[in-house]
């Protein structure tokens, strides 16, 4: 039974996404349907968590919009996620950056990873 599920999940996990992780600043192009037309909306922010669970993989992106922190969870292999572009690599020592929720301003900055 689980072999069949694995094969079906593998068929649906065909989307090519760049390697990214917590601390990286990404731009996610999301398909938004407004009435009869569909357009792409860019959502730029810092990845604070990534969950690798096969087809159920997801990641959380946090940004500050008009002084208010906004977090959005994206399903990695969702048809609504058009593309993910890595703007800058962050150098962090944690897998989950939930502590950024309590920080604001300069304290919430993340060092850039040196190549």
Swiss-Prot record:
SUPFAM superfamilies: Translation proteins SH3-like domain
GO cellular component labels: cytosolic large ribosomal subunit
A Pfam family annotated for this UniProt entry: Ribosomal_L19
Keyword annotations from UniProtKB, A to Z: Ribonucleoprotein, Ribosomal protein
Top-rank lineage group of the source organism: Bacteria
InterPro entries: Ribosomal_bL19 (IPR001857), Ribosomal_bL19_CS (IPR018257), Ribosomal_bL19_sf (IPR038657), Translation_prot_SH3-like_sf (IPR008991)
Similarity annotation: Belongs to the bacterial ribosomal protein bL19 family.
Protein name in UniProt: Large ribosomal subunit protein bL19
The species this protein was found in: Hydrogenovibrio crunogenus (strain DSM 25203 / XCL-2) (Thiomicrospira crunogena)
Phylogenetic lineage: Bacteria, Pseudomonadati, Pseudomonadota, Gammaproteobacteria, Thiotrichales
Gene that this polypeptide is encoded by: rplS
């Amino acid at each position: 039974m689980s072999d069949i599920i694995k094969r079906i999940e593998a068929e649906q996990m065909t989307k090519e996404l760049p390697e990214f992780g917590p601390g990286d600043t990404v731009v996610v192009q999301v398909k938004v349907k407004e009435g009869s037309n569909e357009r792409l909306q860019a959502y730029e922010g810092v990845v604070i968590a990534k969950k690798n669970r096969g087809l159920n993989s997801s990641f959380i992106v946090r940004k500050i919009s008009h002084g208010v922190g906004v977090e959005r969870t994206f399903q990695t292999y969702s048809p609504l996620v058009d593309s993910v572009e890595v703007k800058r690599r962050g150098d962090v020592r944690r897998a989950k950056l939930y502590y950024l929720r309590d920080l604001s301003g300069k304290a919430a900055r993340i060092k850039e990873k040196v190549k």
